[in-house]
Amino acid sequence: MVLPIIIGLGVTMVALSVKSGLNAWTVYKTLSPLTIAKLNNIRIENPTAGYRDALKFKSSLIDEELKNRLNQYQGGFAPRMTEPEALLILDISAREINHLDEKLLKKKHRKAMVRNHPDRGGSPYMAAKINEAKEVLERSVLLRKR
């Protein structure tokens, strides 16, 4: 009489363990290396320092001033938006990341859309990127849910 209850509890515990493990795995797959470092309290000084030379503009046919400006330009958007890129687009500073909640995200998104809305002369592409940045951060583990 007690054996079916014990078996039922065992099966339930195994099922809950598998479910929580799968949920943790799906969250882990969406994390960027920079976010993983932050969650583990690992300080990264300059994550792109190793790639700076690869991005240098090396043409000898242009003047030095223009070459310096091109070397400082980091490029356009990544093919798939990352959390750091979304934070830059929505102008969320390092201090604000610790307090990032739905209210702050909505405020920053609204401010960016007011500045870049297509009805006010902004680019539709930029407006789409702002919306994409908001969606990325809504799915992010950086966002504090209430």
Curated annotation (Swiss-Prot):
A biological-process GO annotation = protein import into mitochondrial matrix
Q: What is its main location?
A: mitochondrion
Instruction: Keywords in alphabetical order, please.
Output: Chaperone, Membrane, Mitochondrion, Mitochondrion inner membrane, Protein transport, Stress response, Translocation, Transport
**Miscellaneous notes for this chain?**
Present with 573 molecules/cell in log phase SD medium.
What PROSITE patterns does the record point to?
DNAJ_2 (PS50076)
Q: Name one GO cellular component term.
A: PAM complex, Tim23 associated import motor
SMART domains referenced in this protein's UniProt entry, alphabetically = DnaJ (SM00271)
Tell me the ranges covered by the J domain, including all copies.
85-146
Name it.
Mitochondrial DnaJ homolog 2
Task: Tell me the organism.
Answer: Saccharomyces cerevisiae (strain ATCC 204508 / S288c) (Baker's yeast)
N-terminal signal peptide: none
Name where it's found: Mitochondrion inner membrane
Organism placement in taxonomy: Eukaryota, Fungi, Dikarya, Ascomycota, Saccharomycotina
Q: What does this protein do, in the record's words? A: Plays a role in mitochondrial biogenesis and protein folding. Participates in the translocation of transit peptide-containing proteins from the inner membrane into the mitochondrial matrix in an ATP-dependent manner, probably by stimulating activity of mtHSP70 (SSC1).
Subunit structure of this chain's protein:
Interacts with PAM16/TIM16 and is recruited by the PAM complex.
Q: Name one GO molecular function term.
A: ATPase activator activity
